[in-house]
Amino acid sequence: MDRKSIESIFNRIRTANCLVIGDLMLDEYLWGKAERISPEAPVQVVDVVREEMRLGGAGNVVNNLVELGAEVTVCSVVGDDDNGQALLEAFGRRGVATDAIFLDATRRTSRKTRVVAAHQQIVRIDRESRVPLSAEVERRVSDWITANAGGFDVILLSDYQKGVLTPGVISATLAAARPGAIPVLVDPKGTDFSRYSGATLLTPNRREAEAASGIAIHDIESLVRAAGVIMERVGLEHLLITRSEEGMSLFSRSAAPMHIPTVAREVFDVSGAGDTVLASLAAGMAAGMEMIEAARLANITAGIAVAKLGTSTVAPAEIINAVALAHSDSDSKIKNRDVLAVLIEAEKARGKRIVFTNGCFDLLHAGHVKYLQKARTLGDLLVLGLNSDASVRRLKGEKRPLIGEQERAHILAALDCIDYVVIFEEDTPLELIAALKPHILAKGGDYTPEGVVGRELVESYGGRVELVSFVDGKSTTNIIERVLERYS
């Protein structure tokens, strides 16, 4: 899987029509600081500084599919309450069809509250209903599925055992999918996977696979035996077992097992990782990918997701970037403004501090390199804004630049201290800074803080300006003068 092929896949995903059926939840996050112990009991006191609501459960599957570019309809049941209304409004903002979300005044909409401080989840509070649907509500859901499910490219069952995926609802789904051979992908729960008999693929994690098979998984041999038991009992064509830091393994009736290693990443939170896997697999299959290629896509996507805190989505730009970096191509560091803004936002979500600097960098020399190396030490990632050829001409005259923008960008991207290069057309980088919102704005020591373009903007949201000293006597102008003196 290379950059061109993954870009082509995302173009096809935009035409995919997906149906998600399952348990919806509202995920509430309370972000704060835990710097005190309560005088009432030996527990931490959290000072809340930010509150956030996210789509959870099957809603996170929907959110991931939308982020990947697919068209999505969701079928579920929520309570006739404020949390249920909040879910409907959130789906509306994402452009998700909600005609098949049924209100049930006898149910409580699931809401999970997570308290987070210093990038750690301290406690989770659950308010939810776990009882199966009433016979009347189950009939309404099943009737809708029978009438409509046959018109989708792929169907996803997201089971959190909160009562929506009753045997009747699952049976109606599988029956509706059968005539058109529509793939049905399931993120299962419980120990009896036979309830999903007739599905195309299940995506249990290792713990769930152990419980369903009755086999303790401690090596590849036991993993293969557990997979065989599950596939035989459920009558599956495919089974994907996720194995945390060991990646994932795909088992198919018509092919040998494929073990896909994980991409090494710092793990912040595994919340919703299974949702990401299910959504990525479905999107890939709807785009016409072979099962193994869809599994590789899911592996890459999940690796990005677990590096974020909380139930999070992964943008196509992040996946394309990960694929490009895996091919060790320094040119993959060169991004346009829109793509880079998405990547930088994702890096911030991982707690990374972003340093930004800019310049023409015509005739790269040792002074430039020393400056950039120092700037990189100010944070976790260094983004370099590079003046375009037209911008350089306006700033330095018609005879400059000596090196074209693409060549300059490729040379700079080859430096280990630079994480991203972005070319800008304006005379100043102000618009680029506004788009990226770096934590630190670095400029050469020949500036004063007041003279740095973007200082007021960066300081307005809590960032800062850092002046980095240059190497004396090193400049492009000096190099040009020496060349003219010696060779003219």
From Swiss-Prot:
Its EC number is 2.7.1.167, 2.7.7.70. ATP binds at N205, R206, R207, E208. One of its GO terms (biological process) is ADP-L-glycero-beta-D-manno-heptose biosynthetic process. It is an enzyme of class 2 (transferase). Coiled coil: none annotated. It holds the Pfam family CTP_transf_like. It comes from Pelobacter propionicus (strain DSM 2379 / NBRC 103807 / OttBd1). HAMAP family: HldE (MF_01603). SUPFAM superfamilies: Nucleotidylyl transferase (SSF52374), Ribokinase-like (SSF53613). Residues 356-488 are annotated as: Cytidylyltransferase. GO terms for molecular function: ATP binding; heptose 7-phosphate kinase activity; heptose-1-phosphate adenylyltransferase activity; phosphotransferase activity, alcohol group as acceptor. It catalyses: D-glycero-beta-D-manno-heptose 7-phosphate + ATP = D-glycero-beta-D-manno-heptose 1,7-bisphosphate + ADP + H(+); D-glycero-beta-D-manno-heptose 1-phosphate + ATP + H(+) = ADP-D-glycero-beta-D-manno-heptose + diphosphate. It comes from the Bacteria. NCBIfam families: cyt_tran_rel, PRK11316.1, rfaE_dom_I, rfaE_dom_II. Catalyzes the ADP transfer from ATP to D-glycero-beta-D-manno-heptose 1-phosphate, yielding ADP-D-glycero-beta-D-manno-heptose. This is Bifunctional protein HldE. The gene is hldE. The keyword tRNA processing does not apply.
